[in-house]
UniProtKB/Swiss-Prot annotation:
Gene3D superfamilies documented for this protein: 3.30.1390.10
GO terms of biological process kind: protein catabolic process; proteolysis
Summary of the function given for this chain in its UniProt record: Involved in the modulation of the specificity of the ClpAP-mediated ATP-dependent protein degradation.
Disulfide bonds: none
Gene: clpS
Pfam family, one: ClpS
Organism per entry: Aeromonas salmonicida (strain A449)
Family: Belongs to the ClpS family.
Protein name, as recorded: ATP-dependent Clp protease adapter protein ClpS
Subunit structure as annotated in this protein's UniProt entry: Binds to the N-terminal domain of the chaperone ClpA.
Length: 105
């Protein structure tokens, strides 16, 4: 191999070593309290869309009820956006004002 090609190859390797992949930004999916959505419906949403068991869903629901909001999980932006749309659509289809939002983690 010529010295020029060897030098170029070594520079590419050095550059590749400097470039490190960063983890994607993460977002919290949050349920916000309201005075109208039944607690049972909130638990149902947490089980249906976030795969929580009854105990965990009840804990998060109580956090929503007493603290004003509760974190459902932390996800990449695309997954968080999808979950927010799914929960808000499901809530409206069931005539509940439950609001799901996302926040930078």
């Amino acid at each position: 191999m010529s010295k020029q090609k060897e030098l170029f190859a070594n520079e590419e390797i050095a550059q590749a070593e400097k470039t490190k992949l960063q983890p994607p930004p993460m977002y919290k999916v949050v349920l916000n309290n309201d005075d109208y959505t039944p607690m049972e419906f909130v638990v149902e949403v947490l089980q249906k869309f976030f795969g929580m068991d009854l105990d965990k869903a009840t804990q998060v629901m109580l956090s929503v009820h007493y603290s004003g909001k509760g974190v459902c999980g932390t996800f990449t932006a695309e997954i968080a956006e999808t979950k927010v749309v799914q929960v808000n659509t499901y809530s409206r289809n069931n005539e509940h004002p439950l609001l799901c939002t996302m926040e930078k983690a």
